[in-house]
A protein has these predicted regions:
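Short alpha-helix in the Rossmann-fold core of NAD(P)-dependent oxidoreductases
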Residues: 19, 27, 49, 77-78
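Catalytic Tyr-x(3-8)-Lys segment
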Residues: 65-84
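C-terminal substrate-recognition "lid" of short-chain dehydrogenase/reductases
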Residues: 78-105, 110, 116-117
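Conserved Rossmann-fold SDR core element
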Residues: 32, 42-56, 98-105
Length: 124
């Protein structure tokens, strides 16, 4: 039996909501929900999963300094490489038991740690 796979590119913003990207976040949240719904509706012949990347490429609305700052505010302090996204897509294609999952590759950006206004403890 031939199995097919759909992989949607979502965004970590569905987990890390800000008031600055309302329409974008709304559309990606809808795609997130569609991914979950279709994974049930299209099973068992078609598997549906998603990837939610974080800071990968500089936006046309960002300066390089702003993008670098965004990357430095993630817990891992690293840019998500396209190769890492490709590897995640390969994982979702190859593993026939995975459906309805959304993998977040964002260096921890969706955890919102850098956005916290309170300092809980010193790391010095």
């Amino acid at each position: 039996m031939l199995f097919r796979s759909i992989i949607n590119i979502i965004d970590q913003r569905v987990k890390n909501i800000t008031p600055y990207f309302t329409s974008y976040t709304l559309s990606k949240s809808a795609l997130y929900t569609l991914t979950k719904s279709l994974s049930v509706f299209l099973a068992p012949k078609i598997r549906v999963n998603g990837i939610s990347p974080g800071p990968t490429l500089k936006s046309k609305n960002q300066t390089q300094k702003q993008f670098d700052n965004q990357v430095q505010r993630t817990p891992l302090k690293k840019q998500v490489r396209l190769e890492e996204i490709n590897n995640a897509i390969d994982y979702l294609i190859e593993n026939k038991s995975v459906t309805g999952e959304v993998l977040t590759l964002d260096s921890g950006q969706s955890l919102g740690w850098a956005n916290s206004k309170s300092k809980v403890f010193s790391t010095d």
